[in-house]
């Protein structure tokens, strides 16, 4: 929970120092991805814990009571029952990543291009929509900046809508 309260710019500085300098990755898409992974890990961990807590203890005790192994109970009872909450947390974390700029500015660089082939350019600096928005505002290109902002807003709202839809769909299928 403490990690969730850390500002994203601090994660960006950590990613720049640790991944960029200490590991020698420099400004690259890989450095940005690793930093974002560490940044959203607390969110995914917390939502997964909450989803696992919502599974009734009677499911666990019932499976173990009829002789199921602990691993079989986790794989066939616990995880499928908690999957709606886990997926919702992952989708919300993706929504947070899409709108992130501070951590990426320090780790992935501020290139003016989006990579055409992700795997051949993974160790090079690249651009994202949030960084493009920042760069357009710096150059007083307000029409382009507002266009990028609208695209970002639609993407984030779409991801949040998808999370709500998936959560509702799984709850309906589960009979909740």
Residue locations for each model-derived region?
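Residue-level recognition of transmembrane alpha-helices
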Residues: 13, 33-36, 77, 106, ...
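Generic hydrophobic transmembrane alpha-helix motif, especially the helices
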Residues: 1-36
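C-terminal transmembrane helix and the adjacent membrane-cytosol boundary/short C-terminal tail
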Residues: 49-53, 57, 64, 91, ...
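Alpha-helical membrane-protein architecture signal
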Residues: 30, 37, 41, 59, ...
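Membrane-embedded alpha-helices of multi-pass transport/permease systems
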Residues: 31, 38-60, 87, 91, ...
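Glycine/proline-centered hinge or cleavage motifs at structural transition points of membrane proteins
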Residues: 7, 66-67, 80
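Interhelical loop and adjacent transmembrane-helix boundary motif
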Residues: 104-152
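Transmembrane alpha-helices
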Residues: 47-48, 70-108
């Amino acid at each position: 929970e403490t990690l969730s309260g850390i500002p994203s710019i601090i994660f960006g500085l950590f990613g720049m120092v640790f991944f960029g300098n200490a590991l020698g990755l420099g400004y690259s898409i890989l450095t940005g991805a690793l930093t974002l992974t560490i940044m959203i890990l607390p969110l995914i961990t917390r939502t997964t814990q909450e989803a696992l807590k919502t599974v009734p203890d009677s499911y666990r005790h019932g499976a173990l009571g009829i002789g199921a192994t602990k691993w079989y109970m986790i794989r066939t009872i616990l995880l499928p029952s908690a999957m709606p909450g886990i997926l919702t947390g992952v989708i919300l974390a993706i929504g947070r990543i899409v709108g992130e700029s501070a951590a990426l500015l320090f780790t992935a660089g501020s290139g003016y291009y989006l990579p055409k082939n992700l795997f051949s350019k993974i160790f090079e600096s690249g651009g994202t929509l949030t960084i493009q928005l920042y760069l357009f505002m710096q150059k007083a290109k307000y029409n382009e900046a507002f266009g990028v902002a609208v695209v970002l807003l639609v993407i984030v709202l779409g991801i949040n809508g998808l999370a709500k839809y998936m959560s509702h769909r799984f709850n309906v299928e589960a009979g909740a």
